Amino acid sequence: KQLLKEALAPEPAPKPAPEPAPEPAPEPAPEAAPEPAAAAPEAAPE
């Protein structure tokens, strides 16, 4: 089964797809999340 998959998918198509997807997704998500969270506790004590 592995030999058939490798022979049918010898093109560089499936490689560039999964690479650029997981990179820009996890970066902007966690960064923009902690920002608004810190602003909440600051305005609370005031």
Swiss-Prot record:
Entry's localization field: Secreted
PAPE repeat spans: 16-19, 20-23, 24-27, 28-31
Main localisation: secreted
Keyword annotations from UniProtKB, A to Z: Repeat, Secreted
Pro residues composition bias: residue spans: 11-33
Annotated source species: Tityus stigmurus
Entry protein name: Pape peptide
Listed GO CC annotations: extracellular region
Tissue specificity field: Expressed by the venom gland.
Entry similarity comment: Belongs to the non-disulfide-bridged peptide (NDBP) superfamily.
Biased composition (Low complexity): 1-10, 34-46
Transmembrane stretches, start-end: none
Location of the region described as Disordered in the Swiss-Prot/TrEMBL record: 1-46
